[in-house]
Amino acid sequence: MTSQTDFLAKLVPGYQGIAQKWECDNMGHLNVSYFFGRSSDQAFFMRHALGLNPASLRDSGHGTVALEEHCRFHREVTSGGMMIGRSAVVELRARTMVVYQEFRDAQDALQATFRTVIGFFDTKARRLVPWPEATREKAAKLSIDLPPHAAPLRVPAGSAVAHVSRADSLAEGFFRTGGAGVNSWECDQFGHMNTMFYVRRQTEAGPHFWQLLGLDQPGLIASGRGFAVSEMRMNYVDELYEGDIVETLSILREVSDRGARVEHRLYNVGTGALS
């Protein structure tokens, strides 16, 4: 067996599907929000491997919640491209754990990697609680070291994000790039907006962001040029539910000869909370 075969054998298999044409962006490859959607699909299999089945979670009033996701995009996926998901535990903590996910094609070429911090959540008290002992035992058997190809590269892993008011963000230089409501079909089995739709708000804000900075994105695409996201980090600060109104504010943090670093902040219009 090769070292890669040995490594893959340690991971929990799960999602297996393809990229649909309607999931691809104006550059012709899978929109980044759908990578996060695949990550959510893979999470079902990881919860199952950890003994967290949907019925027992509902009956006990518990769930899991993503607190931070760091993603690196290693290869573009186009319409019809096959995707195979696998995952493992990287670090087990009292109320949270770090999970590794990866997606590869049918030839095992790496497409994307995720380093995700998840927590065990009391759905009634709306707070994190300790993992069940049975889950801790299963997690210990599914643990690996984070592979180098998933380590943060240009976007560092973060820490807990404190609330920043919309007014303070605007004063810092953020400007409005998007706005939308939360639909019922965007919410997961735990009742809050699925992570991929947090990312969707950002991908929809992107063209407005560059247009407001004076960059003609349609013209770029017509000339055979465009943008590709290589790495991103998501911090989930507050839950969003069906009917909430979300506003996206953005700022250009850094520009280099090969790329740029952009920060987006999502605000709940009704409560003013950073989401």
What does each model-identified segment do?
Residues 2-15, 72-84, 89-163, 236, ...:
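HotDog/MaoC-like acyl-thioester-processing domains
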